[in-house]
Amino acid sequence: MERVSGLLSWTLSRFLWLSGLSEPGAARQPRIMEEKALEVYDLIRTIRDPEKPNTLEELEVVTESCVEVQEINEDDYLVIIRFTPTVPHCSLATLIGLCLRVKLQRCLPFKHKLEIYISEGTHSTEEDINKQINDKERVAAAMENPNLREIVEQCVLEPD
């Protein structure tokens, strides 16, 4: 019986080691990513919709599950947002994506790469909009437009 117990213990520890689960910090990593995802969500949930008096959270444009954070290396993270416009023909989906990007670029306290997408199948021109909101030059050009910049600033303004 003692041999079986020893063999079982060795097999289990070997399995954990091979799967990477016994490395120091490996059990912590999913929790850290979850905490970072909640941190991101807390920043974006209060963004105001450009045409309604509601937040993106209230309209369910963003939810906790739409935020994913992956570790690139020890100090850098990939933040992926998949938001859902209220209607498939939403004319302001690009502006919402711009607001998400601006808010996170300004407020995230850790180094990150940001990817923002419209949830698959939720907008009639999602592919085009995804390209626009992930193109640094287009984002910079949009923020140079004083009218657009003013709208974005109003949307990302923190509530009192």
UniProtKB/Swiss-Prot annotation:
Its main location: cytoplasm. Coiled coil: none annotated. GO terms for cellular component: cytosolic [4Fe-4S] assembly targeting complex. The keyword Cytoplasm applies. It holds the Pfam family FeS_assembly_P. Keywords: Chromosome partition, Cytoplasm, Metal-binding, Zinc. Zn(2+) 2 binds at H89, H123, E150, E153. Zn(2+) 1 binds at H89, H123, E150, E153. GO terms for molecular function: metal ion binding. InterPro entries: FSCA_dom_sf (IPR034904), MIP18 (IPR039796), MIP18-like (IPR002744). The keyword Mitochondrion does not apply. It is found in: Cytoplasm. GO terms for biological process: chromosome segregation; protein maturation. Gene3D superfamilies: 6.10.250.1280, Fe-S cluster assembly (FSCA). Belongs to the MIP18 family. Component of the cytosolic iron-sulfur protein assembly (CIA) complex, a multiprotein complex that mediates the incorporation of iron-sulfur cluster into extramitochondrial Fe/S proteins. As a CIA complex component and in collaboration with CIAO1 specifically matures ACO1 and stabilizes IREB2, connecting cytosolic iron-sulfur protein maturation with cellular iron regulation. May play a role in chromosome segregation through establishment of sister chromatid cohesion. May induce apoptosis in collaboration with APAF1. Monomer and homodimer. Component of the CIA complex. Interacts with CIAO1. Interacts with IREB2. Interacts with APAF1. This is Cytosolic iron-sulfur assembly component 2A. It comes from Bos taurus. The gene is CIAO2A.
